[in-house]
């Protein structure tokens, strides 16, 4: 924990007596320069390394800090989960105000992970109603260091369209003029911001009869976006109880309280426990890495199947983005993507690069072989400069069994592969010849470009063998 956080904790009487049976320490930190955003920290007696940052609701006008905040501390601490209640500032039309508070809270927890016995790769965010919108905004828009590893969303506001979400939240978050800006409304309607692999897994909990925040255009819309993106997501819809029940039990209006806790507990127990000492593997690529056409690509895409083969001693991340090129002058360059920034921030120990299929399109290859070579060299140079000093594997594209989208297998074989081989030798990178090794024409989608789930498993096996050879 840095000196600034420590001094703030001491100034504010940080070491507070135990507030509940499972809480070892409770203290409050200043979370904004003006002192109006606060982070109340509940550290458990028996930490597991997991943590949750909580964003109470209140329509971006006030905060329900009790039943959507502090009352949850014992529930989480009893499971060994550190719990942090965020008192965020109201936007009053400036959405950057609560967002900056939420980003700061996430960074504080990760910056202090060693002192607070937290695994910085196991930090989730939780939000209720408008706080659910804030939590889902962090999940979909934050950079790597502030993005949670999982999300817990209770009856969340997802749409910023006043007619589809919660009008008060929309006007308070975006302002009277902002709500008239369709581009801004779409940007912060978070079902439209879900990204494959980058948006963390989530659980959504809501009531079917919620008339304040309609489930279908909010929580259900987020679930649908997650499912369509191939991301892991769970949803529980309770028959009645409306909106805003939080931690209230049956005696206080929520008859499904115990069932809800059981559902949430089971989901939390199902989450993987990241190994802090795992070898970190970043899979960089296009739609073939992304898992285009493979339902639930986060489970059946080649990076996910590579994870299964490598086991718990490795942590494999999918940084594939569909349609992207290696060429910086291609139609959609990979190195302009958030996924590229995230792959670097991940500080990988191993990097698998498989880019070139889209470069082999007629209009892209018109940029020339030298552009392809220079762009790949630039990517290699950037990765070699990372403090983690990753081992880099350069892969040739798999065969283009058809010329869909003008992708030329001849360009791949006669132009790209020699460049990749020369760069591998020059930069002392490993080379994986997927083009020769991948002979599974019957394991392709009908476009002849993308492997199906069985083909992705074969790809994972080829790459696994190369990694194991070291």
Please give the residue ranges for each predicted region.
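C-terminal catalytic histidine-bearing segment of alpha/beta-hydrolase fold enzymes
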Residues: 220-275, 446-449, 453-457, 470
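Catalytic His-Asp segment of secreted/periplasmic serine-dependent ester chemistry enzymes
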Residues: 242-253, 294, 398-470
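Short beta-strand/loop motif that positions the catalytic acidic residue
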Residues: 203-210
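Conserved SGNH/GDSL esterase-like catalytic core that processes O-acyl groups on lipids
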Residues: 278-282, 288-374, 411
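Catalytic nucleophile-loop/oxyanion-hole region of alpha/beta-hydrolase
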Residues: 64-66, 71-73, 84-120, 251-257
């Amino acid at each position: 924990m840095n000196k600034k956080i420590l001094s703030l904790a001491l100034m504010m009487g940080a070491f507070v007596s135990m507030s509940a049976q499972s809480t070892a320490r409770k203290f409050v930190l200043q979370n904004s320069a003006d002192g109006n955003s606060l982070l109340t920290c509940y550290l458990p007696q028996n930490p597991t390394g997991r943590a949750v940052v909580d964003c109470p609701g209140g329509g971006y006008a006030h905060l329900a800090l009790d039943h959507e905040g502090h009352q949850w501390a014992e529930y989480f601490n009893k499971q060994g989960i550190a719990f942090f209640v965020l008192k965020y500032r109201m936007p009053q039309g400036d959405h950057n105000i609560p967002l900056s508070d939420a980003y700061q809270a996430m960074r504080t927890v990760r910056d202090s992970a060693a002192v607070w016995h937290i695994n910085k790769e196991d930090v989730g965010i939780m939000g209720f109603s408008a706080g659910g919108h804030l939590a889902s905004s962090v999940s979909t828009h934050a950079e790597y260091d502030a993005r949670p590893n999982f999300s817990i969303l209770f009856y969340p506001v997802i749409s910023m369209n006043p007619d589809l979400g919660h009008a008060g939240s929309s006007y308070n978050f975006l302002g009277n003029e902002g709500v008239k800006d369709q581009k801004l409304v779409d940007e912060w309607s978070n079902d439209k911001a879900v990204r494959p692999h980058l948006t963390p897994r989530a659980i959504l909990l809501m009531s079917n009869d919620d008339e304040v925040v309609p489930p279908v255009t909010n929580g259900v819309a987020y679930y649908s976006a997650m499912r369509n993106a191939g991301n892991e997501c769970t949803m529980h819809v309770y028959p009645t109880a409306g909106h805003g029940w939080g931690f209230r039990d049956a005696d206080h209006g929520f008859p499904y309280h115990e069932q809800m806790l059981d559902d949430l507990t089971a989901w939390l127990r199902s989450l993987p426990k990241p190994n802090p000492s795992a070898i970190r593997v970043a899979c960089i690529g296009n739609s073939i890495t992304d898992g285009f056409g493979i339902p639930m690509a986060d489970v059946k895409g080649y990076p996910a199947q590579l994870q299964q083969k490598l086991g718990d001693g490795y942590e494999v991340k999918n940084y594939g983005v569909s349609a992207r090129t290696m060429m910086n002058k291609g139609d959609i360059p990979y190195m302009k993507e958030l996924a590229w920034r995230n792959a670097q921030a991940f500080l990988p120990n191993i990097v698998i690069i498989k880019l070139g299929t889209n470069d082999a399109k007629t209009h892209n290859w018109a940029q020339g072989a030298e552009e392809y070579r220079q762009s790949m060299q630039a990517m290699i140079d950037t990765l070699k400069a990372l403090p983690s000093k990753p081992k880099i594997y350069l892969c040739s594209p798999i065969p283009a069994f058809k010329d869909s989208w003008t992708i030329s297998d001849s360009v791949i074989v006669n132009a790209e592969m020699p460049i990749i081989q020369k760069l591998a030798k020059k930069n002392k990178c490993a080379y994986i010849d997927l083009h020769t090794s991948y002979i599974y024409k019957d394991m392709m989608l009908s476009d002849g470009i993308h492997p199906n789930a069985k083909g992705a498993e074969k790809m994972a096996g080829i790459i696994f063998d190369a990694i194991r050879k070291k």
